[in-house]
Amino acid sequence: MGACTSTCFLVEDSIIKPNLNIIIMESENINDDLKITNQAYQKVKLLGTGSYGKVYLIKSLQTQKEYALKETLITKNKEMFLYFSMNEINILSKLNNPYIISLKCAFKTQIDEETEKLNIIMEYVDNGDLNQLINKYKDDEKFFEEKRLLNWLFQICLSLLYLKENEIIHRDIKPSNIFLLKDDTIKLADFGISKKVSKEDSMFIGTPVYTSPEIISKKDYSYKADIWSLGVTFLQLIFLRLPFLGEDHETLYNNIIHKILNPKILNKDKTGYNEDIIKNYSKEFIDLIDKMVSVNPDDRPSVKEILNKAIIKTRMELYLKENNFDENEIINTFYYLFIYIIISY
């Protein structure tokens, strides 16, 4: 793992232990027997790599609980990675929601005079992300059931409602940032480019294919930008194809701004969606998703309006019954309280 100064303690190459002197943040929402920062961790396996660095599955040697460790190398020419990582830490440290990935702690490791490693220990989500699942279904020539998509939709909307209550826009909603537990519960992740809302913004940021027309046009935008990205995500879940394409960024942006959809998700005369696919879904569901990708943000439903749609409220009520939640569970926990309020609205 390289040379290390006194700002961290390495038992061996695959075991790490945060040093209390250089802890950046530790969540207050921890129910572990031991504080995160008092534990040593065994690296189990590499989960993924990216421009930000690497993500490992780690296990506490004391409690045997599993977590994800994101490592980002910070050098003078990669200060933007530090900005995004610190932004994610600052945002996640203030959040506590069952549909949002939880941050446990963050700490630094000094590698050499010019390089630091930023370490973020997070909740481990054990069943992959929606992008992986989309690719699997496409390979198997299968389609998602509407019931399953509705379950995911209301869970994500509950997380967005919580973010809105905390004045936060995610700004990068896409399948690869939506993770799944084995019980099919979703976890919204990657808050590196999220922001607190003090006023409408016009900064161009996000993943181009999922970015809203108002962001691309450098107009002011707010929470409805997340609704667009969520709508694009669900079009992709329905058709197993990207809704917007372009041989270059200019073409892609033009297609998004004018809602020129991928021809392969349209019917032959391009007057509507591919009927061979949408026949598997209710008109109410398709109409809702289509409304979410309205070019004018004022025409998109808000999170509360989505959650109060009859098709969503019915699915939430059935979800509660299918999972045998009693009234006390509904009332006494944060997540079920949200559902209880909404379906009683």
Give the role of each language-model region.
Residues 226:
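Conserved catalytic-loop aspartate of Hanks-type protein kinases
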Residues 102-115:
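Short beta-strand micro-motifs within the conserved protein kinase catalytic domain, predominantly
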Residues 152-153:
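Activation segment signature within eukaryotic-like protein kinase domains
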Residues 66, 71-95:
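Conserved N-lobe beta3->alphaC-helix segment of eukaryotic protein kinase catalytic domains
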Residues 115-129:
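Conserved short submotifs of the Hanks-type protein kinase catalytic core
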Residues 54:
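Conserved N-lobe ATP-binding subsite of Hanks-type protein kinase domains
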